[in-house]
Each structure stands twice: as structure tokens, then as C-alpha cells.
Regions:
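Active-site neighborhood of HAD-like aspartate-dependent phosphohydrolases
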Residues: 1-48
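Conserved Lys-Pro-Asp/Glu-containing loop-to-beta segment of HAD-superfamily phosphomonoesterases
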Residues: 102-132
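Asp/Glu-rich intrinsically disordered low-complexity tracts
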Residues: 185-203
Length: 203
């Protein structure tokens, strides 16, 4: 069974900017984010990125620039023996009215199709409401981080009609969110061991 985690990029893995991340030099990883992805890999998770990149549609940078940023990310991960299972991006602006710009579910649809699995319960970690909303149609488990736009988003959560978002756990950064996920895994493993012990007692 494939274990997936879906991450937003800007504001979760790397620093964000109101002026967009346009060059490889502007792409700067947030403290702990590379190690957090590596820890997910070591725990058996495939990590996928779903990111809006409207700077392409706005003419602020091109696909070569985007590829250079992602090569930098991949290189940093490789140094820790880690990798991404895929990067799914939307290059469109809001005026394009596309199906893939979050909060529309197109990127999440594409991930489900690519991996051929249900995304029900798959953690989706983001810093904005649109990140978390994008996963609702697939019943992803939303997790908010306070980096990037996250602090402002946290203030908005209580007014959201989607009860799933109101109940989303909030962490300071990706590193802490991964701590939470891995701790949950340990708890599940303990429960499985208890069930096995009960079955042995029945025998």
C-alpha cells in the first residue's frame, strides 16, 4: 500500500514572497523542511508536491526557471538520501478559470490518477485555505503550518463552513507537522501490536 503525503511548496517547503518566487536564487528552503521530507521518506512515505505557480501565467518566470528551482530542491533532498515522488503544478492565473488552480481540485485529481489510490485520509499540508480546500473533494486530512501565510490562515479557520478545516491541526512548521504524523504512526503500530496480543490470548 502506497503511503502518501501531499505538500504545498511556497510557504511550506521554502520561503514565500508576495512578489513570487521567480528564480532559483530566490528559492530558499525553510529551516527543517528538507530534513522533514527525508524523515517522511525514511518512514515509508512517498511525498508529493501540489503547488500553484501563477507567476508563469503572469510572465514573471518561465518553465526553465521553475525546473531550476525544483532541481535545487531535488538536489538538497538527494544529499539526505531522499526524493519527491512527484511535483504537480498549476501555471495559470485566476483569470484563466482553470480546474487545477487550488482551491480547485485538479492537482489533487491528477495525484490520485497518477498513483491510482484513494486519497481518503492522506495528509495534505499547506499554509493557506486554498491548499486545504483543494483536498476536501478527496477527503484528504488537512494540516496547517504557520509558516508562509499560515499564521493569517489560522485566524481565518474558525469562520470556515467546512468542519474538516475548522478541526485541522496546526503546527509551527513542516518539521513539527511531520513529528505529529510519525507519532500517529507509532500509536497505530502500538494498537496493532495490542490487537495481535489479544488474538494470541484467544488462541
Amino acid at each position: 500500500m502506497t503511503k502518501l503525503v501531499i505538500l504545498d511548496r511556497d510557504g511550506v517547503i521554502n520561503q514565500d514572497s508576495d512578489n513570487y518566487i521567480k528564480t532559483v536564487d530566490e528559492w530558499i528552503p525553510l529551516p527543517g523542511s528538507i530534513d522533514a521530507i527525508a524523515r517522511l521518506n525514511r518512514a515509508g512515505y512517498s511525498v508529493v508536491v501540489a503547488t500553484n505557480q501563477s507567476g508563469i501565467g503572469r510572465g514573471l518566470f518561465d518553465l526553465d526557471d521553475l525546473e531550476a528551482m525544483h532541481e535545487k530542491l531535488s538536489g538538497l533532498l538527494a544529499q539526505q538520501g531522499a526524493e519527491l515522488a512527484g511535483i504537480f503544478y498549476c501555471p495559470h492565473t485566476p483569470d484563466d478559470h482553470c480546474h487545477c488552480r487550488k482551491p480547485a481540485p485538479g492537482l489533487i485529481d491528477a495525484i490520485a490518477s497518477e498513483f491510482g489510490v484513494s486519497l481518503n485520509g492522506v495528509p495534505l499540508i499547506g499554509d493557506s485555505l486554498r491548499d486545504l480546500q483543494a483536498g476536501l473533494s478527496h477527503q484528504c486530512t488537512p494540516i496547517l503550518v504557520r509558516t508562509g501565510k499560515g499564521t493569517a490562515t489560522e485566524k481565518k479557520l474558525s469562520s470556515q463552513p467546512e468542519i474538516e478545516l475548522q478541526q485541522a491541526p496546526v503546527f509551527d512548521d513542516l518539521d513539527q507537522a511531520v513529528d505529529y504524523l510519525l507519532a500517529q504512526d507509532k500509536d497505530k503500530d502500538k494498537d496493532k501490536d495490542k490487537d495481535k496480543d489479544k488474538d494470541k490470548d484467544k488462541d
